[in-house]
Regions:
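Flexible "arm" and connector segments at domain edges
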Residues: 1-107
Length: 107
């Protein structure tokens, strides 16, 4: 089976445990960022799809995947979860969150 995509670190090991031989390569920095961005889009689409009648646990699992990719992207710039949370809080203080469910029609 052909994949041609960034996978989690243990995936080749898991494939090998199934008596298959994974063919892999290590990405360079620029390609790694590109593939992380592609993976983020993929995982966000899966979060949306999980909202279509799937269980709350499935959506939570998909949100966890999004967070994992976000953390990998943040790590490239030497940021971590605390930094992401701080940036989100600063934005929330300036512009608010989404708690009030406000839908802007026009200005």
């Amino acid at each position: 089976m052909e994949y041609n995509k960034l996978v989690r670190d243990r995936i080749p090991e898991i494939i090998a445990e199934d008596n298959r031989e994974p063919k892999t390569r290590i990405l360079g920095e620029e390609e790694y960022v590109t593939e992380l961005e592609r993976k983020l889009r993929e995982e966000c689409e899966e979060v949306i799809a999980a909202g279509d009648g799937d269980s709350a646990e499935h959506r939570l699992e998909e949100l966890g995947d999004v967070l994992e990719v976000m953390l990998a992207l943040a790590k490239i710039d030497h940021f971590g979860l605390d930094d992401i949370a701080f940036a989100a809080e600063q934005k929330r203080k300036k512009r608010g969150g989404f708690d009030k469910r406000i839908y802007l029609i026009e200005d």
